A protein has these predicted regions:
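Hydrophobic alpha-helical segments
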Residues: 1-157
Length: 157
């Protein structure tokens, strides 16, 4: 049983309903997380704004891979289920890739560097080394993208 009530779209505050409709239009479903956050229209607006902003330099595959790696570190079954669904249906990742992603790796070398870094961020609570930062930058990630990897980890926590 959920500790907080998860509203249906119609039970959500009126100010949250357009945001929930947008999520449903994009994903084809409205995950429970979004419906729960909709209890606070301000929180939903902020969550959706941050999620949208992070979609500008890191592609959907990279963001979903990071979410899978972070969910595994956090041992969050709900998050793993949700991001596996999104990985398959939105990011178009295959099962082999998603299994690697959950372990903080990828078949793609550049994505692998992002995931190794993201996993270290999650496991160390953000206390990464200069060597960790240098490795992800060597893979071609700009400073702004390194920050966005960190924020994607935080968004998944």
């Amino acid at each position: 049983m959920s500790r907080l009530s998860i509203p249906t779209r119609d039970e959500a505050p009126a100010a949250s309903q357009p945001g929930l409709d947008a999520v449903n239009a994009q994903l084809g479903v409205t995950p429970n997380l979004f419906r729960l956050v909709s209890l606070s229209p301000a929180a939903l607006e902020g969550f959706l704004s941050l999620s949208g902003a992070l979609g500008k330099t890191l592609d959907v595959k990279t963001r979903n891979r990071i979410a899978l790696a972070t969910a595994q570190v956090n041992e969050c079954d709900y998050c793993l289920s949700a991001h596996s669904y999104l990985g398959a249906n939105l990011a178009k990742l295959d099962e082999t890739e998603m299994a690697l992603n959950r372990k903080g790796h990828s078949i793609d070398a550049r994505a692998d560097a992002a995931l190794v870094f993201a996993r270290k961020v999650a496991m160390s609570k953000g206390k990464v080394s200069e060597t960790d930062i240098a490795a992800v930058r060597l893979a071609g990630f700009r400073e702004a993208q390194v920050i966005e990897i960190v924020v994607n980890v935080a968004l998944t926590v």
